[in-house]
Swiss-Prot record:
This is Heat-inducible transcription repressor HrcA. Keywords: Repressor, Stress response, Transcription, Transcription regulation. Negative regulator of class I heat shock genes (grpE-dnaK-dnaJ and groELS operons). Prevents heat-shock induction of these operons. PANTHER family: HEAT-INDUCIBLE TRANSCRIPTION REPRESSOR HRCA. Belongs to the HrcA family. Gene3D superfamilies: 3.30.450.40, Heat-inducible transcription repressor hrca homolog, domain 3, Winged helix-like DNA-binding domain superfamily/Winged helix DNA-binding domain. NCBIfam families: hrcA. Coiled coil: none annotated. GO terms for molecular function: DNA binding; DNA-binding transcription factor activity. The lineage of its organism: Bacteria, Bacillati, Actinomycetota, Actinomycetes, Frankiales. One of its GO terms (biological process) is negative regulation of DNA-templated transcription.
Amino acid sequence: MLEERRLEVLRAIVEDFVLSNEPVGSKALAERHNLGVSPATVRNDMSALEEEGYITQPHTSAGRIPTDKGYRLFVDRLSGVKPLSRAERRAIQSFLEGAVDLDDVVRRSVRLLAQLTRQVAVVQYPSLSSSSVRHIEVVTLGPRRMLMVMITDTGRVEQRIIDSLTPVDEEIAGELRATLNCALAGQRLVDAPEVVATLPDQARPELRPCLATMTGAVLESLVDRPEERLAMAGTANLTRASVDFADSLRSILEALEEQVVLMKLIGSARETGTVTVRIGRETDVDALRSTAVVATGYGRGPFALGGMGVVGPMRMDYPWTMAAVRAVAKYVGELLGAD
């Protein structure tokens, strides 16, 4: 267990390096921070921290910089989440409240997160597995053609144009609408296939062909559309921090283009209010071993509808980044949870 003073020295090294991007020396630490000890004592503490693998010396004439292990200890033991000011919280809330639909909520959220943190921001659309049916609308488009619109409780909209084998009119469309809403409104989407499978057999004979076609469309809308969608913003922010990456910036950008990689990093945040931080090799992605990922879930209650977070260099302001991610997630969850 490190002594408290050495923890303070590590905290000071991380904060100074994040701010300056320059190796930190013992004399500068003693002058800038109220550590209560001499530069010689600070130097001894730094030597101990280096032996433990928390800091390293990039070259012989330089000071020290944090390692992956040092950043990990800083996040776990030393950094608190900075509280946002009332003005900052109000600005976030006002910007998000201007959204007109789910796509706009996601677009605004990912842009805002990228601007606040100056990192690459990623927001996952509400997962189908976490959503429920709010309403189904059926509209006639012609004698044998209908439009089916399914709206989830998170604002996700799925549309299908359906060609019927039998003629349809407004009366039939209304009956289909009523039947589907009676059976599915409030149902979780993951439970919907089992529910709709039995509907045609329960309908009056004249309605069964249309209802069978309609329930097939409902199933297709759940199966054919990708389960998970992501939005990303702020990739240009990586270029401003290119000196922080041991690997080429190109390999990092290529990794971020892979949805499966992003889902692994962001979509795994399944709890609201809990911010997770993966540093360096903890990302389990070779191309991202020079980066850090800060993520959390958003939604109503303790379980997340989706995840959001940022990807940036390990040399980031963790307390501020964690606060920004948590704040945006909180307001997005409240917005999507509003009736």
